[in-house]
Swiss-Prot record:
Record lineage: Eukaryota, Metazoa, Chordata, Craniata, Vertebrata
Family: Belongs to the protein disulfide isomerase family.
EC number(s) on file: 5.3.4.1
Residue interval(s) of motif Prevents secretion from ER: 514-517
Disulfide bond positions: 83-92, 180-183, 303-306, 424-427
Annotated organism of origin: Rattus norvegicus
Molecular function GO terms recorded: protein disulfide isomerase activity; protein-disulfide reductase activity
CDD domains: PDI_a_PDIR, PDI_b_PDIR_N
Protein name: Protein disulfide-isomerase A5
InterPro entries (UniProt xref): PDI, PDI_a_PDIR, PDI_b_PDIR_N, Thioredoxin-like_sf, Thioredoxin_CS, Thioredoxin_domain
Length: 517
């Protein structure tokens, strides 16, 4: 009997720590067979897999993921693969999991609709992982931004009411939606202001887009995002409406908070008088038929670029319309009122110029100044064909879109990707260097230089998933897995040196394997 107890004690001593000290949810599926993982990815469309160097390395993550699994039950699946286990090693190699660096003990990979989606690189917290699994393509939580540590982040109506009841200091509360572009613009300034006024005023944020916050939206008249409300001792006083403000503007306003001043409505351009003809859905066709040469500016009252161009356009109209020998006229259309015309001419940005010769629409170059308007209207000529875009040029750069991004990268051992916008001046400066780098490695089948135009509609989700916040952004991928953000020199020498270092590492590892044999 004593020997039996001794044997049991011995077994207890060698039991893995996680079995004895970590409560792992039965909702976490442990997998070691590649076929089992393949089957699971085929039948589940939202899977987060924890790959660990060993059982011990996985311990703290398993504790956290056990709670996550319960929170996303029915919406997502969590699996665990112990790469230190002999049976699982083959699976980890097949899934291209590299835990060889000394400081790398675990990896979290997300799979969606049966395919690799991304390496999880957001905050490893209950709230962040749950939010990610409930919306894998959604933006990170605001509180994940290290710069937002001084903003009080509110998650529930209960927490909001508690804050109002207990907070003695003045409170500036931003009600926002995660997808809102205006919110994203002001957030960095809001959080910077929060740091500057810390100890004197509380700045807080709350995502009220979910339907459970309808009561709060109704109570505080949230009709758009963001809506920023000012409170003192829990009592709502008024809204802060300077949504284009900087951190300094917010801090200055908080020194003496005042309600918004009633805005004086702007006089419509058509009512100001002037030399430009203002056309509508009803009279546009007749006007264009009666005038042999018409340049039309489609505009919107709120558009800053339109306001900047308006005096130039008016001055040019005054000159042209006062010249008896000139047959050209300038006209304007408010696209927010005359929606039929805006739709007919596919107006999607402001200002947009359209030119009509004898009633027929013709191409018009980019014109913005009084001088250019006059010169061109005195001698309208078809503009030269636009230069081919980077994507249209014959180069060795792979131009990827959301549909083929993952599959293409998985086929290349080393890929440097440039996320860019065609209008971005920094991008234009880098493009020749990046193109030359791609040409230099065009014969190496394991290397690729790729580019993604983030302005294209079909790429916007992809650029958001890859956390692209500025242009250009460079990411290095190893068989489709994001390894690091490239932040070295943006020159041909910088790019080629980085890639050559990667290839030299490949050769050293190959030589070492040969020596081991």
């Amino acid at each position: 009997m004593a020997r039996a107890w001794g044997l049991l004690l011995a077994i207890g001593v060698i039991l893995p720590t996680w079995l004895s000290s970590t409560k792992v949810s039965s909702l976490i599926e442990r997998i070691s067979d590649p076929k089992d993982l393949k089957k699971l990815l085929r039948t589940r469309n939202n899977v987060l897999v924890l790959y660990s160097e060993s059982e011990v390395a996985a311990e703290s993550h398993l504790k956290l993921l056990s709670t996550v699994a319960q929170a996303v039950k029915g919406q997502g699946t969590i699996c665990w693969v112990d790469c230190g286990d002999a049976e699982s090693r083959k699976l980890c190699k097949k899934m291209k999991v590299d835990l060889s660096p000394k400081d790398k003990k675990i990896e979290l990979f997300h799979y969606q609709d049966g395919a690799f989606h991304m390496q999880y690189d957001r905050a490893v917290t209950l709230k962040s992982i749950v939010a990610f699994l409930k919306d894998p393509k959604g933006p990170p939580l605001w509180e994940e931004d290290p710069g937002a540590k001084d903003v009080v982040h509110i998650d529930s109506e209960k927490d909001f009411r508690r804050l109002l009841k207990k907070e003695e200091k003045p409170l500036l509360m931003m009600f926002y939606a995660p997808w809102c572009s205006m919110c994203k613009r002001i957030m960095p300034h809001f959080q910077k202001a929060a740091t500057q006024v810390r100890g004197h005023t509380v700045l807080a944020g709350m995502n009220v887009y979910p339907p459970e916050f309808e009561n709060i939206k109704e109570e505080y008249n949230v009709r758009g995002y963001p809506t920023i409300c000012y409170f003192e001792k829990g009592r709502f006083l008024f809204q802060y409406e300077n949504y284009g403000s900087t951190a300094e503007d917010i801090v200055e306003w908080l020194k003496n908070p005042q309600p918004p001043q009633p805005q004086v409505p702007e006089t419509p351009w058509a009512d100001e008088g002037g030399s430009v003809y203002h056309l509508t859905d009803e009279d546009f066709d007749q006007f264009v038929k009666e005038h042999s040469s018409v340049l039309v500016m489609f505009h919107a009252p709120w558009c800053g670029h339109c306001k900047k161009m308006k005096p130039e356009f008016e001055s040019a109209a005054e000159v042209l319309h006062g010249d008896a020998e000139s047959s050209g006229v300038l006209a304007a259309v408010d696209a927010t009122i005359n929606e039929a015309l805006a739709e007919r001419f596919h107006i999607s940005a402001f200002p947009t110029l359209k030119y009509f010769k004898n009633g027929e629409q013709q191409a018009v170059p980019a014109l913005r100044t009084k001088k250019k308007f006059i010169e061109w209207m005195q001698n309208p000529e078809a503009p030269p064909p636009p230069e081919p875009t980077w994507e249209e040029q014959q180069t060795s750069v792979l131009h990827l879109v959301g549909d083929n991004f993952r599959e293409t990268l998985k086929k290349k051992k080393h890929t440097l990707v440039m996320f860019y916008a065609p209008w971005c001046p920094h991008c234009k400066k880098v493009i020749p260097h990046f193109t030359a780098t791609a040409d230099a490695f065009k014969d190496d089948r394991k290397i690729a230089c790729a580019a993604v135009d983030c302005v294209k509609d079909k790429n916007q989700d992809l650029c958001q998933q890859e956390s692209v916040k500025a242009y250009p952004t460079f990411h290095y991928y190893h068989y489709g897995k994001l390894v690091e953000k490239y932040e070295s020199d943006r020159t041909e020498l910088g790019f080629t040196s980085f890639i050559r270092t990667l290839r030299e590492g490949d050769l050293k590892r190959l030589e070492k394997r040969r020596e081991d044999l």
